Amino acid sequence: MPIITLPNGDQKSFDQPVSVMQVAQSIGPGLAKNTVAGRVNDRLVDACDLITEDATLQIITPKDPEGVEIIRHSCAHLVGHAVKQLFPDVQMVIGPVIEEGFYYDIFSPKPFTLDDMAAIEARMKQLIDQDYDVVKKMTPREQVIQEFTTRGETYKLRLIDDMPEETQMGLYYHQEYVDMCRGPHVPNTKFLKNFKLTKISGAYWRGDAKNEQLQRIYGTAWSDKKELAAYIKRIEEAEKRDHRKIGKALDLFHMQEEAPGMVFWHANGWTIYQALEQYMRKVQQDNGYQEVRTPQIVDFTLWEKSGHAANYAENMFTTHSESRNYAVKPMNCPCHVQVFNQGLKSYRDLPVRLAEFGSCHRNEPSGSLHGIMRVRGFTQDDGHIFCTKEQIGKEVADFIQLTLDVYKDFGFEDVQMKLSTRPEKRVGDDRLWDLAEKSLADALDAAGLEWELQPGEGAFYGPKIEFSLKDCLGRVWQCGTIQCDFNLPIRLDASFVTEDNERDQPVMLHRAILGSFERFIGILIEHYAGFMPPWLAPVQACVMNITDSQAEACQQVVAKLKENGLRAISDLRNEKIGFKIRERTLERIPYLLVLGDREVEEGTVNVRTRSGKNLGTMSIDAFVDLVKSAVAERGRYIVE
């Protein structure tokens, strides 16, 4: 006789075991109609699952975040149903939920095409219209093996082998199609109407490039049409803002097969890169950092001593010379410890703050490379602070404020911060972890902003704070970090002399604000759709003549703008002024200056912005002041 306690405290008694759906029906037909699953004693279960004893129950509907995830997971199974009807010879692998969607990996003798994807989506809609029930059957292990053996689903059998402890498994039947899953899933296909397949890509079995290649079909699903439409609109906008397309259109950079994951910066893109570097150099100098430069290639023994060889070897590029093995550095930290170790350090010398625009290389899988967002060769605004345990709090607090100020300069006000604390496997004693975690939490509280705790997500060598930016499309990008490290200073023999004339290891704080320059520039390109604020624009002003008689005056204006530190060019082509304005507008140049006979005679310029706003006629000095004012405001200034 189970007694069910609902979220509002109401209780319902039943004479016998009762399913989640039956409880929903006892509350009302409207709720039952919208029941996707249930949360029984804080565990998600299927709507058909029985409750046999007293329990708490929350009915999950499409309005709940869990309901949306269940809809997405069930849509992945629906992909399997449609694919097996259209392509019976393929083998289904795995179909998990991901952020804002789902995918299904499939082994197919031939790659799927966009036409295939359209056919799969159409078949999915036909199946949804059949309004069939999804049937769950808990099945003994041997029967599950027999089921998938009969169906020739070898990948499912391999997955079963990975779960030797499971004596029975959930099989979900979509009519003649069956899939294996822990669930829960929707009770009926009526919940799956608001979906769309989005793309096809390649993947590897178990994510290992040494294994066979699979076809991955991506999709998204939502609880209603409006949410789906809004998502599709965001995706379309994101495609328009794709940094690879804009990078090509604005002549910023290119990638090519001969150097996978390495960026060929063009003059325009390199100007943006240099603006970032010069800005960050001044920020670091103003905040007590010493800029250093360390080698690109270092003997492999250092990486063995630091622990990177044991844990990171697959991602390291290596080389050999004169009987010695070397690695191209994937990160700067061990090298910065070598700089710190030169000369005896006293507690009076701490903190020591080292910074480097460190060029690093990591052997990322070719399938994961993505424009300049995911590369093999990159530069970090890397820094390491060597301090005492007592100095952790102040150093972290100062870094948080510095990071938030930098993000504001780039136009990012919405910053998410997460504190990751001790994992089960870790180094260092608990008192040190207590101190470090409290120091980081107190520093976050002092910043006066909300932050999220991630228990157990810290690195084995210390807790960390991660900083993530939200862009104009609502996408979240993890960029900055500060991490306490109790391990590397010990491994690499870093020490200082204490006030008691004893030797002690410093705490090492790994920190970065932008992260990878390449990735951060990619984020900026997509955030601004290439319409960079004046301080980052490769060309800040273009001076154009109406007829040949103003050509010399245009060149003189450009020369004066350059003398004042502006990035300016001229356009003296024998084209109509309207054509030149349109073309330079497409290049996202913030300011377009036009000279006719009147402007030449008066020594003025007619100024308009790339958005078409006419700022009128002004002196050259006034225009210089206008641009310098805009540059001083950095990302806070919007060119209208």
UniProtKB/Swiss-Prot annotation:
It catalyses: tRNA(Thr) + L-threonine + ATP = L-threonyl-tRNA(Thr) + AMP + diphosphate + H(+). PROSITE patterns: AA_TRNA_LIGASE_II (PS50862), TGS (PS51880). Binds 1 zinc ion per subunit. It is an enzyme of class 6 (ligase). Zn(2+) binds at residues 333, 384, 510. One of its GO terms (cellular component) is cytosol. CDD domains: TGS_ThrRS, ThrRS_anticodon, ThrRS_core. Signal peptide: none annotated. One of its GO terms (molecular function) is tRNA binding. Gene3D superfamilies: 3.10.20.30, 3.30.54.20, Anticodon-binding domain (3.40.50.800), Bira Bifunctional Protein, Domain 2 (3.30.930.10), Threonyl-trna Synthetase, Chain A, domain 2 (3.30.980.10). Residues 1-61 form the TGS domain. Keywords: Aminoacyl-tRNA synthetase, ATP-binding, Cytoplasm, Ligase, Metal-binding, Nucleotide-binding, Protein biosynthesis, RNA-binding, tRNA-binding, Zinc. Residues 242-533 are annotated as: Catalytic. InterPro entries: aa-tRNA-synt_IIb, aa-tRNA-synth_II, aa-tRNA-synth_II/BPL/LPL, Anticodon-bd, Anticodon-bd_dom_sf, Beta-grasp_dom_sf, TGS, TGS-like. Pfam families: HGTP_anticodon, TGS, tRNA-synt_2b, tRNA_SAD. Its EC number is 6.1.1.3. Its cofactor is Zn(2+). It comes from the Bacteria. Its main location: cytoplasm. PANTHER family: THREONINE--TRNA LIGASE, CHLOROPLASTIC_MITOCHONDRIAL 2, THREONINE-TRNA LIGASE. Belongs to the class-II aminoacyl-tRNA synthetase family. Catalyzes the attachment of threonine to tRNA(Thr) in a two-step reaction: L-threonine is first activated by ATP to form Thr-AMP and then transferred to the acceptor end of tRNA(Thr). Also edits incorrectly charged L-seryl-tRNA(Thr). Homodimer. This is Threonine--tRNA ligase. The lineage of its organism: Bacteria, Pseudomonadati, Pseudomonadota, Gammaproteobacteria, Moraxellales.
